[in-house]
């Protein structure tokens, strides 16, 4: 295990990332009992820049832990040989966009989040982005056993683009295959991603929590890979 973690750390650093704030391993084990059947979504393959009008859309329509305040969130995903493309949008009138600095707690702003893990693996990524395009990334097994990933050019590395109008906001970005292979060297865009899509805003005027796949926790907690849905790569 120590040798594996050392190799992983060296691979991350060689790609220009810093792994920050390692945490003590949590004793929590995922309880798979009494889990509802997960939602599923097909990730279509594209050639060239995605035409988002042709990409299936999922809805993060599970309203969690707070009263419904009318906010809605949606996601679209596709891929080619080099990247996974992500488009997330929110219908949200009152937007909070306070943070611009790296490593900021963007979940306190109007935040759109994508958590994913290749099937059969034990570490997942969380990508959290606010309306300013400020990105926060972690990788790990659960809420406690994880580390922050940082490099100075995150927006350029993931080609983040944000848009905003009177009805809400959206974000586009792409996750390169070679980034995922830093952690899973044999990963291919095939098979299944276990994943969830979230919308939150802990310090907005109307705090809210939404998810694509249902969450079985009684208190706010997005770090539950046992509650991920299935995203299936189409050939």
Language-model segments: what does each one mean?
Residues 22-235:
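Structural preference for beta-rich elements and adjacent junctions enriched in aromatics
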Residues 1-29:
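Bacterial Sec-dependent N-terminal signal peptides
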């Amino acid at each position: 295990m120590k040798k594996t973690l050392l190799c992983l750390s060296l691979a991350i650093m060689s790609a220009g990332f810093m792994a920050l704030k390692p945490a003590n391993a949590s004793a929590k084990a995922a309880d798979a009992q009494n889990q509802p059947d997960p939602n599923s979504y097909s990730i279509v393959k594209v050639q060239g820049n995605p035409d988002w009008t042709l990409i299936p859309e999922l809805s993060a329509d599970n309203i969690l832990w707070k009263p419904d305040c009318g906010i809605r969130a949606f996601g679209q995903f596709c891929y080619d040989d080099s990247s996974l493309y992500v488009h997330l949008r929110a219908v949200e009138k009152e937007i909070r966009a306070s943070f611009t600095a790296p490593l900021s707690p963007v979940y306190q702003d109007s935040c759109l989040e994508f958590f994913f893990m290749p099937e059969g693996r034990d570490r997942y990524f969380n990508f959290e982005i606010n309306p300013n395009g400020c990105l926060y990334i972690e990788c790990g097994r659960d809420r406690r056993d994880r580390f922050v990933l940082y490099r100075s050019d995150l927006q350029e590395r993931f080609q983040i683009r944000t848009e905003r109008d009177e009805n809400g906001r959206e974000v586009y970005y792409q996750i390169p295959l070679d980034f995922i292979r830093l952690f899973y060297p044999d990963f291919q865009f095939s098979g299944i991603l276990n994943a969830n899509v979230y919308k939150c805003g802990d310090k907005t005027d109307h705090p809210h929590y939404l998810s694509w796949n249902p969450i079985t926790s009684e208190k706010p907690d997005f770090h539950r890979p046992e509650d991920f849905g299935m995203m299936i790569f189409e050939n």
